[in-house]
Amino acid sequence: MKEVNLVLGVIGADVHAIGNKILEYALTNAGFKVHNLGVMVSQEEFVKAALETDAKAVLVSSLYGHGEIDCRGLKEKFIEAGLDDVLLYVGGNLVVGKQDFSEVERKFKAMGFDRVFPPGTMPEEAIKALKEDLGLM
């Protein structure tokens, strides 16, 4: 596989790091070049990293339930930066309270995310989706 740059991070005030490290490990082992921004990442930091690394995809996670607030407007920032062709993935515990995941997925796709993953998604599922969406299969 040719080198494909990805940006990975946990958005907003979220400090949940374990899943982020697991994803970094799995994505690296799958052959991707991962630029992990860690936790408490702002929208602007995601955009800057995508520009600097020529990222083909950005994977945003949120586990503290405020992803809907933290992710609002992110796609617009990518478009403003000329990055409208960069894939945007989001996953985790994205909303407060129990909501039907199909409704959560609909909300995030309406915000411009290409893929939305529920809590408990295995890394292999995201890797498969990336390979499909990037034409690497």
From Swiss-Prot:
GO terms for molecular function: cobalamin binding; metal ion binding; methylaspartate mutase activity. Residues 3-137 form the B12-binding domain. Keywords: Cobalamin, Cobalt, Isomerase, Metal-binding. It catalyses: (2S,3S)-3-methyl-L-aspartate = L-glutamate. It holds the Pfam family B12-binding. It is an enzyme of class 5 (isomerase). InterPro entries: Acid_CoA_mut_C, Cobalamin-bd, Cobalamin-bd_sf, GlmS. Its cofactor is adenosylcob(III)alamin. It comes from the Bacteria. Adenosylcob(III)alamin binds at residues 13-17, 61-63, 93-97. GO terms for biological process: anaerobic glutamate catabolic process; glutamate catabolic process via L-citramalate. The keyword Metal-binding applies. Transmembrane segments: none annotated. Pathway: Amino-acid degradation; L-glutamate degradation via mesaconate pathway; acetate and pyruvate from L-glutamate: step 1/4. Its EC number is 5.4.99.1. Belongs to the methylaspartate mutase GlmS subunit family. Catalyzes the carbon skeleton rearrangement of L-glutamate to L-threo-3-methylaspartate ((2S,3S)-3-methylaspartate). Heterotetramer composed of 2 epsilon subunits (GlmE) and 2 sigma subunits (GlmS). GlmE exists as a homodimer and GlmS as a monomer. This is Glutamate mutase sigma subunit. It comes from Carboxydothermus hydrogenoformans (strain ATCC BAA-161 / DSM 6008 / Z-2901). The lineage of its organism: Bacteria, Bacillati, Bacillota, Clostridia, Thermoanaerobacterales. The gene is glmS.
